[in-house]
Structures are given as structure tokens and as C-alpha cells.
Amino acid sequence: MKPSIVLYKNIPADLRERLEQHFTVHAFDGLTPDNHDELRQALQQAEGIIGSGGKIDEAFLQQTPKLRAASTISVGYDNFDVDALNAHNVLLMHTPTVLTETVADTIMSLVLATARRVVEVAERVKAGEWQGSIGADWFGVDVHHKTIGILGMGRIGLALAQRAHFGFGMPVLYNARRTHEEAEQRFNARRCDLDTLLAESDFICITLPLTDETFHMISRDQLAKMKKSGILINAGRGPVVDEAALIEALQNGTIHAAGLDVFEKEPLPVSSPLLTLPNVVALPHIGSATHETRYGMAECAVDNLIAALTGTVKENCVNPQLLKK
């Protein structure tokens, strides 16, 4: 008899067929076990779950007594209580290798859009304001040969450094827990403390995950240390930045602009002051949102779940210590 799994996000038909070759698949639109009897029953029998979003914590795990593996269609896993998963001997799989280049492209697009005011001036054209030669009030600032500061030098940070160095001739600073030899050798990147990075960078790009250490890592004091001409880009996790402090800094000119793909609350409330500021480019968390990459992420998550439930895990496991038990 095939193991039972719960699929809680729509995936391409061919990938669902692959799951069905290995498992009995119960498909749902999201995870709401408290409100959905059929889902609750499926979770009682599920040995694996696969999807994205939803809060997977102790309360959830109490409803999944047979669960052996969870496969998230994402690189981030801050919605999972890893300690609770460990206590229940549940493997957590994610997709860190698939989306690197696409997210780096998104970050670079935010750098360009904020510097050259692409969204703002495009809207002015659509509004009929382009009536002759443009003046200084339409101008942006250069990107090439400006200094980029990268918070977090993982896969995405490295891919961003490559684009900045080779594509735009930008000096690269980075802040990370350890020296990244490849970044320093290939891109002449310089590791520095956070205060130095804030003070010297023209563009500060956040690629960090959300942890206890990174929560509100950028707040009022840190924003005050940036150049007044500085631009903040966040494509890591929203709560890494104190959003209220950022709004204040953008309103009073402490920093020049911000490009944001992530927010403290998502979707971003329509009442957010960020949506009223012309010096903000706000995207709906589209860092990995291309057809090719989203397919690749789903494919990787399917492979991960199959590996986890057949005892063939070689990569992409958040809690590999469980494999030794």
C-alpha cells in the first residue's frame, strides 16, 4: 500500500503524476485543519506533506501522528517550528538551490528601478505628464561603479555580487558570519562589520533569512547610519527590517529610497504608508516568481519528498541529524 501524503498547493500536472506514482495523494488548497474535516482526516493518515505557506508548529503536528516528512516549495522555512519537527522526528525539506539566479535578478531589478525611478516616471508618462524635454525632477542616480553592500553572503548574495561586480563595475561589501573566500577572490568583495557597510554602501541589499538574530536587524539606528543618498533593498524576509522605522526614514529623508519585495505583513495592507511614497518600489514577493523557476521549485520539492519517504535523502534537508536516528 502506498504511503499517504497531503498536497496543499497546486503544482503542474506532470509533477502531481510523479507523486501519484509513489504515494496516495490527497490534494487541498492550503492548510486549514481546524476548519476542514476532510483535510483533518487526511492529515491523520499522512506520512508526508508538500506545499508552501501555512504554519507548521506543535499544534499542527499533534494532528499528524504518522508524519515523517514535510517538503516546502520554498527556500525559506520560517513558518516551520524546526524544534517541534525535530521532537516529532519529521524531516524538513526545502529548495535552496533552484531559485538563486532568479532571486538575484529580482534584487538587481530593484536596484535599477529605485535608482532610475523606473516605476515612478513610467506612471508619470502614463498620466500624460511628458509634455516636452524632461528636467531634473525626472532624473535618477547612477548604478554603475557605486558601492553595493550585501547582508548575507549565501547563494543569493554570491549571485548578486557577481551581477554587481561584472555587470556594473560595483565595489562589493558584505556582512556575514564568516569570510566568503569565493566572493573575495572572484569579485574582490570585502567583508566588514554592519556599521561600516551601512556607512559606505550606496545600495544595501538584504538577502538574509528571518531568525531571532536577524529580526529588526535594520531599524532606526541602522537606517540613520546609511548615506542620505543610500537605497535599501529587501528581498530576504520582511521582518528583518523594522517597517515603521523604514517608513519614517523614507518620509524624512534619512535615506533616499527603498526597493521592497518582502514586508512585515504579507500581503502588504492597502493602508500602508509605503504605498503612498514615490521613493518606494513595492513588489508582491515575486523574488522567485518566473514560470521556469516556480516549476523548478515544485519539481525539487517533489524530488525531496520522494527522497525523504524512501530513505534516499542526499541534499536539501534542514534537519539532517534526524537521518542518523
Swiss-Prot record:
One of its GO terms (molecular function) is NAD binding. InterPro entries: D-isomer_2-hydroxyacid_DH, D-isomer_2_OHA_DH_cat_dom, D-isomer_DH_CS, D-isomer_DH_NAD-bd, Glyo/OHPyrv_Rdtase_B, NAD(P)-bd_dom_sf. The active site is at 237, 266, 285 (proton donor). It is found in: Cytoplasm. Keywords: Cytoplasm, NAD, NADP, Oxidoreductase. PROSITE patterns: D_2_HYDROXYACID_DH_3. Homodimer. This is Glyoxylate/hydroxypyruvate reductase B. It comes from Serratia proteamaculans (strain 568). The gene is ghrB.
